[in-house]
Amino acid sequence: MGKTAIFIFTIINRILKEEIKGDLACLVLCHTRELAYQISKETRRFCKGFTEEINKNMRTILLIGGDNEKDQIKDLKKKPKIIIGTPGRILSLTKKNNVLNLNNIQIFVIDECDKMLNALGKFKIFKNFKLYYILYI
């Protein structure tokens, strides 16, 4: 939980200080569904202590294979600040018109990047990012 807490608190802090503008602020990419689920669960737990208004502005969604894609598309329409997901599902949703646009992501976290680098080689979805912060965990 230590490294997860560090990068999640950093993301939350930057969003709260309004250093990050726009709807979608952060993408956390994980090499497994289980890891993505764990990080999503921890992020929601960390945000529970905030007021309802802050919690609403800190909307987090989980985009992983095996979950209902139509439900995930509905969640994306609610304009999340943080997306946590796996490369396959992220790629799938970026290929659908007007579903997921990653051009304005300002923080991109690759969790367990040593295991992720091989997977990223297979996906060419992150080529035109304007990133202000990149955290390799």
Whereabouts are the PLM-identified features?
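Conserved helicase ATPase motor motifs in RecA-like P-loop NTPase domains
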Residues: 1, 27-33, 110-116, 130-137
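Walker A/P-loop
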Residues: 1-11
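Short coil/turn segments at secondary-structure boundaries
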Residues: 8-9, 40-41, 75, 121-122
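Conserved protein kinase catalytic domain
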Residues: 12, 44, 126-130
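Conserved nucleic-acid-binding Ia/Ib motif block in the N-terminal RecA-like helicase ATPase lobe
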Residues: 20-96, 104-107
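SF2 helicase catalytic motif II
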Residues: 90, 94-132
